[in-house]
Amino acid sequence: MPQLDTSTWFINIVSMILTLFIVFQLKISKHSYPTHPEVKTTKMTKHSAPWESKWTKIYSPLSLPQQ
């Protein structure tokens, strides 16, 4: 059974990492970021659910009989 030739693995891995780095740098450099980011205020709207206006009884668990 022949041995696996690993002599070219190093250059392949290094070139792949370098290519990925360059591609990601090019993708990131095309993004335009705002120079002065501002906080966007959002209004909280209250959604009323039908069960909020009704009184509901909360049942406590059954207690053990007194001994």
From Swiss-Prot:
Using the record, list the residue span of the signal peptide; answer none if the entry has no such feature: none
Where in or outside the cell? Answer: Mitochondrion membrane
Residues that the record marks as modified (N6-succinyllysine) are: 54
Keyword check for RNA-binding = no
UniProt membrane topology term? Single-pass membrane protein
Q: Does the keyword Protein biosynthesis apply?
A: no
Sorted alphabetically, the Gene Ontology cellular component annotations on this record are: mitochondrial membrane; proton-transporting ATP synthase complex
Pfam families recorded: ATP-synt_8
* Protein name, entry field: ATP synthase F(0) complex subunit 8
Instruction: Provide the organism lineage as a comma list.
Output: Eukaryota, Metazoa, Chordata, Craniata, Vertebrata
